[in-house]
């Protein structure tokens, strides 16, 4: 037991430590934030007991930090524990439950577990709508998060509708410089990019960049995201030199923030590789693709969708250079991962089969090409029938 005076001291210490945790997290100082979050958990357990909501708050903070650091298993475990404590103390409909559900869903998204994430995002959104109403900023954030998931699942019309809802709410609340509206603008730009509407996408990306720069400062991870997305448009438009310049800015910010072996760096290496391929610098492209694959394998693991993307990209490079044996190895490895993660009847599996079929056709391996092409068509027919 602690005395009343000790309790007051610990109470102030927990408040201060939690504040510093959040401040460091927002500034992208994740190692410092993690140590402070661990300390706040210890303080909360000592003064309030292991089942206190303040323990849950501290656990939730640490889970968010671990998520951005790529420590997904630890993040998931902490988030589940925090959710259990909150539900036991506050009941299933409290707004704090919505926050924890949202964070756990975000961890599942980071791990590529999209099916597990959707019901959590939906439950979180329902709680927010009930607690705050449909035009509240918290509800807008809920729309944005669910839209992010739909975008990743290629459910673009549903995603666009939710992004526009979120932006409307932010603007109604005169919150046009809030980082969250930057997120919604950035993600709506992704939809325009996918549809080939590059001018519209670039305008939205630049708006997001300006908002984040004011709200977060020039070296914040969100700035790296904005620069990365602007670079992506330049790449798609064939402006490879400008794209490479911006991607290297992204790499500099992310290496400073996360270290050299973070999964965000894997994506940037992949993007630089694509630029190098566009410039005809094939040896450099191969080197950067391999770097992306190695980092992804060591951080996200081989069952993550990004890993398949990197495998397919290096396979495409080998196919273009008529190094068919190496291309086949990476295409097949990507196909096996997709079948394991999504099942054998997923459209992404069909696309991977078509990549192999196209390569076999160019080699004159007509029977192999026909076999994979027919399998892909069968999957697409089933998908259309079930949609």
What name fits each language-model region?
Residues 6-8, 46-50, 88-92, 130-134, ...:
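Short coil/turn linkers that connect adjacent helices within long alpha-helical scaffolds
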Residues 12-39, 43-46, 68:
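Alpha-helical segment of the N-proximal tetratricopeptide repeat
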Residues 15-26, 53-68, 79, 95-110, ...:
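Conserved alpha-helical positions within TPR/SEL1-like repeat arrays
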Residues 41-46, 83-88, 125-130, 167-172, ...:
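Amphipathic alpha-helical segments of tetratricopeptide repeats
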Residues 332, 361-384:
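TPR/TPR-like (Sel1-like) alpha-helical repeat modules
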């Amino acid at each position: 037991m602690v005395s009343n005076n000790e309790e007051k001291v610990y109470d102030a210490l927990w408040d201060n430590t939690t504040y510093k945790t959040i401040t460091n997290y927002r500034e992208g100082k994740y190692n410092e934030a993690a140590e402070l979050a661990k300390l706040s958990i210890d303080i909360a357990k000592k003064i309030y007991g292991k089942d206190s909501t303040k323990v849950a708050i501290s656990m939730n903070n640490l889970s968010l930090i671990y998520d951005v650091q790529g420590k997904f298993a630890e993040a998931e475990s902490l988030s589940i524990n925090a959710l259990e404590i909150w539900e036991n103390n506050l009941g299933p409909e409290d707004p704090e439950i919505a926050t924890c559900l949202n964070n756990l869903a975000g961890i599942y998204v980071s791990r590529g577990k999209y099916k597990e994430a959707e019901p959590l995002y939906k439950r979180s959104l329902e709680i927010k709508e009930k607690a705050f109403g449909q035009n509240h900023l918290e509800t807008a954030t809920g729309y944005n998060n669910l839209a992010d998931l739909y975008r990743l699942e290629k459910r673009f019309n549903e995603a666009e509708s939710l992004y526009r809802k979120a932006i409307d709410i932010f603007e109604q609340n005169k919150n046009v410089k809030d980082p969250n509206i930057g997120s919604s603008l950035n993600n709506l730009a992704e939809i325009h990019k996918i549809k080939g509407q590059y001018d519209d996408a670039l305008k939205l990306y630049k708006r997001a960049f300006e908002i984040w720069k004011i709200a977060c400062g020039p070296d914040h991870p969100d700035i790296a995201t904005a620069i990365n997305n602007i670079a992506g448009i330049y790449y798609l438009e064939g402006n490879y030199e400008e794209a490479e310049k911006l991607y290297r800015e992204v790499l500099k910010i992310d290496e400073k923030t996360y270290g050299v072996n973070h999964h965000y760096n894997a994506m940037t290496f992949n993007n630089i590789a694509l630029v190098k391929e566009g410039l005809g610098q094939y040896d450099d492209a191969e080197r950067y693709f391999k770097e992306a694959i190695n980092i992804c394998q060591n951080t996200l693991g081989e069952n993550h969708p990004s890993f398949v993307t990197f495998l397919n990209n290096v396979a495409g490079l080998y196919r273009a250079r008529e190094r068919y044996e190496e291309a086949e190895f990476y295409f097949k490895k990507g196909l096996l991962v997709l079948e394991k993660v999504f099942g054998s009847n997923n459209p992404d599996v069909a696309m991977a089969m078509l990549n192999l079929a196209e390569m076999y056709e160019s080699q004159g391996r007509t029977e192999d090409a026909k076999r994979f092409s027919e399998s892909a068509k069968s999957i697409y027919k089933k998908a259309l029938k079930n949609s």
